[in-house]
Amino acid sequence: MAVPFRRTSKTVKRKRRTHFKLSVPGMVECPSCGEAKLAHRVCKACGTYKGKEVISK
């Protein structure tokens, strides 16, 4: 089995990991109730999507 020829330095390791970051979710305001919700998803507070009630509460 292959073994690394040299030890990976802290700098090289950290530079490689700069791209392994989490992205912020796209939060928007619900047009019917004003709660914060994820874009392109049903609002958890009022149950509407694209102006129509999808989930009755």
Swiss-Prot record:
Name of the protein: Large ribosomal subunit protein bL32
GO MF, one example: structural constituent of ribosome
Pfam families: Ribosomal_L32p
UniProt keyword annotations, A-Z: Ribonucleoprotein, Ribosomal protein
Upper classification of the organism: Bacteria, Bacillati, Bacillota, Bacilli, Bacillales
An annotated GO cellular component: large ribosomal subunit
Disulfide-bonded cysteines: none
GO annotation (BP), single: translation
Stated family: Belongs to the bacterial ribosomal protein bL32 family.
Domain of life: Bacteria
Protein's UniProt keywords contain Plastid: no
SUPFAM superfamilies xrefs: Zn-binding ribosomal proteins
